[in-house]
UniProtKB/Swiss-Prot annotation:
It is found in: Periplasm. Mg(2+) binds at residues 70, 72, 193. This is Class B acid phosphatase. Substrate binds at residues 138-139, 178. Its EC number is 3.1.3.2. Pfam families: Acid_phosphat_B. The gene is aphA. GO terms for molecular function: acid phosphatase activity; metal ion binding. Dephosphorylates several organic phosphate monoesters. Also has a phosphotransferase activity catalyzing the transfer of low-energy phosphate groups from organic phosphate monoesters to free hydroxyl groups of various organic compounds.
Length: 238
């Protein structure tokens, strides 16, 4: 009788433990992140991706030319200066972009806080090696003095023979201010992160190549790279 009682007790205990485990599994919340696999990780947006090496290869046999670069978010991660400008001159709004005092600061020293992008180092080095003439065309407002040209030349080790002073195209409503400069300087290739950079290039028949804007840039919203069928450089967000 005692053996039967012990067997029944063991069975009841086992049943209770099993029920507890089942209930625990049933009540557990589904994982927040379902995980991924190699196929998903390898997915890329169906746009015209290119590497710096592929761009270089496409230029083999071509003589030296004039090439242009936008500055902010293309060759420099300059959000620190713009962030400080907003906090200083117009907290919570973009009014600081119309304030000449901000541009005097930004164009005369605040780029010391800007981070040169690695993709820009690779691109500029490649074009310098080819003997190309380097232009920087920015939408920043022009100021009486500027140190941006020297900062860029120092950051990217551009020889004097290849370097041209920064062109401050400014920003005018309803007008793409970079177009005239691309035409005037006979630019053959233009790199930029914004839609205006790509459309300016296309408007004058120039090869426009998209550089990805970093996701933590203060310049929002992020543009849709590849939307105009342009080439987009891989891993160019930094």
């Amino acid at each position: 009788m005692r053996k039967i009682t012990l067997a029944l007790s063991a069975f009841c205990l086992l049943f209770t433990l099993n029920s507890t485990v089942v209930d625990a599994h049933a009540s557990s919340p589904s994982p927040l992140y379902p995980g991924t696999n190699v196929a998903k990780l390898a997915e890329q947006a169906p746009i015209h991706w290119v590497s710096v090496a592929q761009i270089e290869n496409s230029l083999v046999g071509r003589p030296p030319m004039a090439v242009g670069f936008d500055i902010d978010d293309t060759v420099l991660f300059s959000s620190p200066g713009f962030w400080r400008g907003q906090k200083t001159y117009s907290p919570g709004s973009d009014a600081y972009l119309k304030n000449p005092e901000f541009w005097e600061k930004m164009n005369n020293g605040w780029d010391e806080f800007s981070i040169p992008k690695e993709v820009a180092r690779a691109l500029i080095s490649m074009h310098v090696k080819r003997g190309d003439s380097i232009y920087f065309i920015t939408g920043r407002s022009e100021t009486r003095t500027e140190t941006v040209s020297k900062t860029l030349q120092d950051d990217f080790l551009i020889p004097a023979d290849n370097m041209n002073p920064v062109i401050f195209a400014g920003d005018k409503a309803g007008q793409n201010t970079k177009t005239q400069w691309l035409r005037e300087k006979n630019i053959k290739m233009f790199y930029g992160d914004s839609d205006n950079d790509i459309t300016a290039a296309h408007d004058v028949g120039v090869r426009g190549i998209r550089v990805l804007r970093a996701s933590n840039s203060t310049y929002k919203p992020l543009p849709m790279a590849g939307a105009f069928g342009e080439e987009v450089i891989v891993n160019s967000e930094y």
